[in-house]
C-alpha cells in the first residue's frame, strides 16, 4: 500500500520534505547523485517536492550519464531526424551542449526523433530562425539577440536544465491542478485548468505507480515516514469503499 499511495502525494504541500539520504536512494549512485543541491533549489524555487523532480528525471532516463537527453552530445541521425528539421532550416546537424532532464517536449514529429525534438526544445531550436547562429554545422540560440526563452531556456547547463524543467512542471502542471503523479498522467483533477482527461505528461500508464514506488523507497531511506504528507485521492461515484 505505502509503495503506491505516493502517486497521490500533493507536490506543493510536501515541497520541503527531502534530504540527501532520500535523494541518494533515488539516484542509486547514478548520474543524478551529482545534482542534489540543484534539485533542492529547483524544488524550493518552484514550490514542488524535490524528490518528485528527481524521481521524474530518473524515470525519464536522466540517471544514466550517457543518455542522449543529458549527455550534452547529440548528432542528427538521418534515419530518424529529417533534413527538414535541421538542414533546410539551417540550424545545424548537432544539438551539443543542451540538456533535458525531464524529456520535456520529447515526442516524435515534425521531422524530429523524440530525443531530438526534446533537445531542440531545450536549445530553443523550435523558435524563429532569426535567433540562430550556425557555425560548422552547429546551431546556437543567440540569447543576446533574442533574450531568454520561457522556462529559462536555452538549457545549456545541467543546473539550468534542472531548474528550467522544474519551472515548466510547476507552471504547466502542478499549479494548474495536476499536482500529483496520478493527475499528471490521468487528468481527472477537479481543479484542473485543462479539459478533463487531457494534458497528460507521459504516455506510460505505469509511470505513476513506478514513480510512487521510488518516492516511498526514498522516504524510507531518508527516515521521513513521520512527516506530514497530504494526499489527493480521487474517489469515483459508486466506488466500493
Feature roles, as predicted:
Residues 31, 40-48, 149-153, 157:
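Conserved aromatic-histidine-acidic binding/catalytic patches
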Residues 70-72, 77:
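Extended amphipathic alpha-helical segments with heptad-repeat/coiled-coil character used for oligomerization
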Residues 80, 84-241:
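Non-catalytic cell-wall polysaccharide-engagement segments
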Residues 37-41, 54, 163, 167:
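Solvent-exposed, polar/charged alpha-helical surfaces in well-ordered, non-transmembrane soluble domains
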Residues 40-68:
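Short, functionally critical alpha-helical segments immediately adjacent to catalytic or ligand/cofactor-binding
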Residues 1-36:
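N-terminal export signals and maturation junctions of secreted/periplasmic proteins
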Amino acid at each position: 500500500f505505502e509503495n503506491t499511495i505516493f502517486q497521490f502525494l500533493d507536490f506543493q504541500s510536501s515541497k520541503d520534505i527531502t534530504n540527501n539520504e532520500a535523494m541518494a536512494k533515488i539516484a542509486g549512485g547514478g548520474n543524478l547523485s551529482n545534482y542534489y543541491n540543484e534539485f533542492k533549489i529547483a524544488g524550493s524555487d518552484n514550490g514542488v517536492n524535490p524528490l518528485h523532480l528527481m524521481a521524474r528525471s530518473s524515470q525519464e532516463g536522466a540517471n544514466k550519464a550517457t543518455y542522449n537527453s543529458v549527455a550534452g552530445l547529440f548528432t542528427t541521425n538521418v534515419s530518424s531526424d529529417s533534413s527538414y528539421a535541421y538542414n533546410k532550416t539551417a540550424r545545424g546537424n548537432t544539438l551539443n551542449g543542451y540538456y533535458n532532464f525531464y524529456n520535456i517536449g520529447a515526442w516524435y514529429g515534425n521531422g524530429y526523433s523524440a530525443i531530438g525534438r526534446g533537445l531542440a526544445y531545450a536549445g530553443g531550436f523550435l523558435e524563429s530562425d532569426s535567433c540562430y547562429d550556425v557555425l560548422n554545422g552547429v546551431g546556437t540560440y543567440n540569447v543576446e539577440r533574442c533574450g531568454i526563452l520561457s522556462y529559462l531556456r536555452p538549457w545549456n547547463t545541467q543546473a539550468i536544465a534542472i531548474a528550467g524543467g522544474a519551472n515548466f512542471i510547476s507552471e504547466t502542471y502542478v499549479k494548474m491542478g495536476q499536482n500529483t503523479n496520478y493527475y499528471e498522467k490521468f487528468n481527472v483533477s477537479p481543479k484542473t485548468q485543462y479539459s478533463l482527461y487531457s494534458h497528460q505528461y507521459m504516455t506510460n500508464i505505469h509511470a505513476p505507480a513506478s514513480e510512487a514506488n521510488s518516492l516511498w523507497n526514498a522516504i524510507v531511506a531518508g527516515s521521513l515516514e513521520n512527516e506530514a504528507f497530504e494526499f489527493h485521492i480521487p474517489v469515483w461515484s459508486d466506488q466500493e469503499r
